[in-house]
A protein has these predicted regions:
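A structural signal for short, hydrophobic/glycine-enriched beta-strand patches
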Residues: 4-164
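A transmembrane-helix-recognition feature enriched in membrane-embedded lipid enzymes
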Residues: 165-192
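Short linear elements at protein peripheries
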Residues: 23-24, 189-195
């Protein structure tokens, strides 16, 4: 396919993997615990950080709490399955649950200050790393806290075949639009309703 190298290069623009060992925490962003948390466990085992911190998303359906559907319960189950005894903490939300990467950045900044962290690695899906890192760097500017990013891959698509799946197309087309919005904002857009 003549277009495959171009589409792969486009996808690679969105991926950042600049995490270094010695971080205070691996911060797993919400919205993809099934891929992001196992990646954080790998990084924990490789000595990147001594703890894993989960962000606190706003639940779409509060009734699911009793079923163990929140991300902390899922992370606990994944940790048990892996056999890795990584400490898991939850970063409390400043406003009743994060609805965006900007919300998570503000929440994590407050958490880092309270715990005197100097270096964190955010763990998210590979296609989300550039925008997530950009949002965190904007919010963390002047804090003297170093922020890095590492991406998690999934079993459905990669940067080399994303255009062959609905989920890959959705991820990479939407990510471009989201990146453009994040360039101009430092918080959730007032015209976008996040629930």
């Amino acid at each position: 396919m003549f277009h495959a190298p171009l589409l792969s290069a486009y996808a690679r623009f969105f991926s950042v993997a600049n995490g270094t060992q010695g971080a205070d925490a691996l911060v797993v962003l919400s919205g993809g615990i099934e891929t992001r948390f196992p990646r954080a466990l790998e990084l924990y085992q490789q000595g990147f950080a001594p703890r894993i911190v989960l962000t606190d998303p706003r639940l779409r359906n509060e009734r699911l709490l009793n079923l163990g559907c929140e991300e902390k319960a899922q992370a606990d189950a994944l940790r048990r399955l892996s056999g890795v005894q990584a400490p898991i903490e939850v970063c409390p939300s400043l406003k009743g649950g994060a609805t965006s990467t900007f919300d998570e950045a503000y929440d994590v900044l407050a958490y880092c200050k309270a715990h005197r962290f100097r270096h964190i690695i955010i763990v998210t899906d590979h296609y989300h790393t550039r925008r997530a890192l950009y949002a965190f760097e904007k919010i963390f500017r002047g804090s003297q806290i170093r922020v890095e990013a590492m991406g998690a891959h999934n079993d459905i698509f990669t940067p080399d075949n994303w255009w062959r799946t609905d989920r890959g197309i959705e991820a990479y087309v939407l990510e471009l639009m989201k990146c453009m919005v994040y360039v101009f904002l430092k918080k959730n857009a007032p015209f976008i309703q996040n629930y």
